[in-house]
């Protein structure tokens, strides 16, 4: 219950910009957030490996 309420609270637009919390749009995780993709590192890795994020591919050299 606490996690659900925190996710809903983070999605609301705050009165002041500094009160904004970055949370993953998919799972609600507050840590390891990637701003460019609006998701956490775990969801990013999962979706990138499945090829669901356009322009992102696994690097190899």
Swiss-Prot record:
One of its GO terms (biological process) is translation. Its cofactor is Zn(2+). Gene3D superfamilies: 30s Ribosomal Protein S14, Chain N (4.10.830.10). Keywords: Metal-binding, Ribonucleoprotein, Ribosomal protein, RNA-binding, rRNA-binding, Zinc. Zn(2+) binds at residues 24, 27, 40, 43. Transmembrane segments: none annotated. This is Small ribosomal subunit protein uS14. It comes from Borreliella afzelii (strain PKo) (Borrelia afzelii).
